[in-house]
UniProtKB/Swiss-Prot annotation:
Belongs to the bacterial ribosomal protein bL20 family. It comes from Bacteroides fragilis (strain ATCC 25285 / DSM 2151 / CCUG 4856 / JCM 11019 / LMG 10263 / NCTC 9343 / Onslow / VPI 2553 / EN-2). NCBIfam families: rplT_bact. GO terms for biological process: ribosomal large subunit assembly; translation. This is Large ribosomal subunit protein bL20. InterPro entries: Ribosomal_bL20, RIBOSOMAL_L20_CS, Ribosomal_protein_bL20_C.
Length: 116
């Protein structure tokens, strides 16, 4: 009895991956094994960088807060310590947004931290 293979499903699976790799350079877009490896590696990078994105944004917020705090004559660590003592629970994302888009509100927050 001859071997039975489901060629339709195999071709559909390969076609699906090759469709996902459109726009890649060279053999990465049309050679099955190269395209599959590239696509899998891309998923690995995506998984890793979804986690790294959170670290990068936190670092960016801290840099922005530090720069704005130093314009007000305070370091980042003194500002955060003062906010903690004053009982002001405001996260770094919002603080960075205040520093960039609403400097007057940020100055008011810094003033409260200085008093504490």
């Amino acid at each position: 009895m001859p071997r039975s293979v489901n060629h339709v499903a195999s071709k559909a699976r390969r076609k699906k991956i090759l469709k996902l790799t459109r726009g890649y350079f060279g053999a990465r877009k049309n050679v099955w094994t190269v395209a599959k490896n590239t696509w899998e590696k891309g998923l690995t990078y995506a998984f890793r960088d979804r986690r790294n994105k959170k670290r990068n944004f936190r670092a960016l917020w801290i840099q922005r807060i530090n720069a704005a705090a130093r314009l007000e004559g305070m370091s980042y660590s003194k500002l955060m310590g003062g906010l903690h003592k004053a009982g002001i629970e405001i996260n770094r994302k919002v603080l960075a947004d205040l520093a960039v888009n609403h400097p007057e509100a940020f100055k008011a927050v810094v003033a409260k931290a200085k008093v504490a």
